[in-house]
Amino acid sequence: MGKEIQLKPKANVSSYVHFLLNYRNKFKEQQPNTYVGFKEFSRKCSEKWRSISKHEKAKYEALAKLDKARYQEEMMNYVGKRKKRRKRDPQEPRRPPSSFLLFCQDHYAQLKRENPNWSVVQVAKATGKMWSTATDLEKHPYEQRVALLRAKYFEELELYRKQCNARKKYRMSARNRCRGKRVRQS
């Protein structure tokens, strides 16, 4: 009466893989007691694949198209596992941006004004090139800003963690009071 476990559909395979499977079965029928190593067998298959006519290849390509259609149909009906995302505490301080991100923030508007028809991706590529060609002297102000922001972040994080610990202690002491136990004050 529980939920049915739905397995992910088997991926579609190419025309060459269909040929390979067919060729392997024929080879086993013709020479059942012969062992051929993977490398040698792969070489034989690729030679045979190159030598067959387009008419024969069309048969395998049709199989591959059918397999692809089957896979796409199954994927439309497939409902995979939902990944649970960790809920972020809104009170938790956000990490500071990197020196590169600060550089991008400063230069984005300028590049957009100069090139209004550029997409966000094109502007990002341009700022990336500007950053990689910038000298250490040009990068230094951004690195200083990052150092200040990082110091501020760690102070806020320390304060946040103290507040979280205080809330946890309060919750624990409230539970203990409900149970009739004494709580040690520290």
UniProtKB/Swiss-Prot annotation:
SMART domains reported in the protein's UniProt record: HMG
Cellular-component GO terms for this entry: chromosome; nucleus
Localization, UniProt: Nucleus; Chromosome
Chief location of this protein within or outside the cell: nucleus
GO biological process: regulation of transcription by RNA polymerase II
The keyword rRNA-binding appears for this protein: no
InterPro entries per UniProt: HMG_box_dom (IPR009071), HMG_box_dom_sf (IPR036910), HMGB (IPR050342)
GO molecular function: DNA binding, bending
UniProt keyword annotations, A-Z: Chromosome, DNA-binding, Nucleus, Repeat
DNA-binding region coordinates: 9-79, 93-161
Keyword Repeat annotated: yes
Annotated region described as Disordered, given as residue ranges: 77-98
Stored Pfam families: HMG_box (PF00505), HMG_box_2 (PF09011)
Origin superkingdom: Eukaryota
Coiled coil: none
Family: Belongs to the HMGB family.
PANTHER family: HIGH MOBILITY GROUP PROTEIN B4, HIGH MOBILITY GROUP PROTEIN DSP1
Protein name: High mobility group protein B4
